[in-house]
């Protein structure tokens, strides 16, 4: 038995079966490359679901981590830490919003946005108590906690977890008329992934986000975007909503906000929205801790200094164009923006993900028939060409 096999056996024995990973063990990683205990190297084409946009162990992020770890790592929000204000300022300037609320995981940030939207609706829109509604979209994925699960349109994500939370409506992604019909006097917010990730990298019709912005303005509704996966350069722009040139009322950020090192998330909005929270009404022991703030500042500096959004846009266009040239009837469609790419197949995608793993390329199927290619944004054209050769070998 190899070391990897022994590790997998132990993991499956002691761990709850809530994941079905590819049969590989990762012991080291740097840049876009991953190494298993046997010394085999693989190209990372998943980037931890876009949490590793800056690449594995980016030197500037690791330097910030080590430097801060030698000072102070956690004080809780019972006290002020010396770098939290700097991080707030960084995220505020990035989003153009007045206030920031720090959390840890993306799901926590979604829960925060839902709570903020509901309280805002009661305090600023005078919706009757306990009647506020939030509109989401079929195919959405906002996390695994109860609000995101209740928002979901996937029966399997909800099975056995009832009673679900009330006050959530779902409409088809990209259908303006359905959205118009769903809006009523109790609508507090519209929550959208500007590119649906887990649903198979679904890009909305051109101008759709502008229509949402218009409807939100006309009806005094908060426009909230979950940019946890699609944001911070992944789509080829800082935020995927930038493709339609729209500004949001609420940004939900996560994943790459932590530079591939720590779980760091945030909700950014103007004072009218986030000032609905009062001391004790919401919080997190670890949210905005000194270590997280230092790492996230460095992670955002890397995104800006290395122009990773522009890099994603240019290389993503090239990658997609080359994928579209692969002549195989099993490939139904290649779609995406930047280095956020989905290859939809006419059959189950899992065997192809496993075959790509054997060729030294790590990716993952999503929504059964879609292979997601979302490498760290530091990838080079030469490395993309290398990946394309491996992909062509599997699909030849």
UniProtKB/Swiss-Prot annotation:
Quickly give the catalysed reaction. Answer: a 2-oxocarboxylate + L-ornithine = L-glutamate 5-semialdehyde + an L-alpha-amino acid
- GO terms for biological process? L-proline biosynthetic process
Which residues carry the post-translational modification N6-(pyridoxal phosphate)lysine, per the record? 255
Q: Name the SUPFAM superfamilies for this protein.
A: PLP-dependent transferases (SSF53383)
Which InterPro entries does the record cross-reference, listed alphabetically? Aminotrans_3, Aminotrans_3_PPA_site, Class-III_PLP-dep_AT, Orn_aminotrans, Ornith_aminotrans_bact, PyrdxlP-dep_Trfase, PyrdxlP-dep_Trfase_major, PyrdxlP-dep_Trfase_small
Disulfide pairings: none
Cite the PROSITE patterns for this sequence: AA_TRANSFER_CLASS_3
Mind listing the UniProt keywords for this protein, alphabetically?
Amino-acid biosynthesis, Aminotransferase, Cytoplasm, Proline biosynthesis, Pyridoxal phosphate, Transferase
Can the keyword Transferase be found in this entry's annotation? yes
Q: What is its EC number?
A: 2.6.1.13
Q: Which CDD domains match?
A: OAT_like
Is Transferase set as a keyword in this record?
yes
The UniProt entry's sequence similarity note says: Belongs to the class-III pyridoxal-phosphate-dependent aminotransferase family. OAT subfamily.
Q: Which NCBIfam families is this protein grouped with?
A: Orn_aminotrans (TIGR01885), PRK01278.1 (NF002325), PRK04073.1 (NF003145)
> What is its biological role?
Catalyzes the interconversion of ornithine to glutamate semialdehyde.
Name the UniProt record assigns to this protein? Ornithine aminotransferase
Gene from which this protein is expressed: rocD
């Amino acid at each position: 038995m190899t070391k990897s096999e022994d590790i997998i056996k132990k993991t499956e024995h002691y761990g709850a079966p809530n994941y079905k990973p590819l049969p590989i063990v990762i012991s080291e990683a740097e840049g876009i490359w991953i190494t298993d205990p046997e010394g085999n190297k693989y190209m990372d084409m998943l980037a931890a679901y876009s949490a590793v946009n800056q690449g594995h162990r980016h030197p500037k992020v690791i330097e910030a981590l080590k430097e801060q770890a030698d000072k102070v790592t956690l004080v809780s929000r019972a006290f002020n830490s010396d770098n939290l204000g700097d991080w707030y300022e960084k995220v505020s300037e990035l989003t153009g919003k007045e206030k920031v609320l720090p959390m840890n995981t993306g799901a926590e940030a979604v829960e925060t946005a839902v709570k903020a939207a509901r309280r805002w609706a009661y305090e600023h829109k005078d919706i009757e108590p306990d009647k506020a509604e939030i509109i989401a979209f079929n195919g959405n994925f906002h996390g695994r906690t109860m609000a995101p699960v209740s928002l979901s349109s996937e029966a399997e994500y909800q099975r056995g977890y009832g009673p679900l939370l009330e006050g959530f409506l779902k409409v088809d992604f990209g259908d303006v008329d359905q959205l118009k019909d769903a809006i009523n006097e109790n609508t507090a917010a519209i929550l959208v992934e500007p590119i649906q990730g887990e649903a198979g990298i679904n890009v909305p019709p051109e101008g759709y986000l502008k229509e949402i912005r218009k409807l939100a303005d006309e009806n005094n509704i908060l426009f909230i975007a979950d940019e946890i996966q699609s944001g911070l350069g992944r789509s080829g722009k800082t935020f995927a909503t930038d493709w339609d040139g729209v500004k949001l009322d609420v940004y939900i950020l996560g994943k790459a906000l932590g530079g591939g090192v720590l779980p760091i998330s945030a909700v950014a909005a103007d004072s009218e929205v986030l000032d609905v929270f009062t001391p004790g009404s919401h919080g997190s022991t670890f949210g905005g801790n000194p270590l997280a703030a230092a790492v996230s500042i460095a992670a955002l500096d890397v995104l800006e200094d290395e122009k990773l959004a522009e890099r994603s846009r240019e290389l993503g266009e090239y990658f997609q164009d080359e994928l579209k040239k692969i002549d195989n009837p099993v490939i139904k469609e290649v779609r995406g923006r930047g280095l956020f790419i989905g290859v939809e197949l006419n059959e189950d995608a899992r065997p192809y993900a496993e075959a790509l793993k054997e060729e030294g390329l790590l990716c993952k199927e999503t929504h059964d028939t879609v292979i997601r290619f979302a490498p760290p944004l530091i990838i080079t054209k030469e490395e993309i060409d290398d990946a394309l050769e491996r992909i062509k070998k599997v699909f030849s």
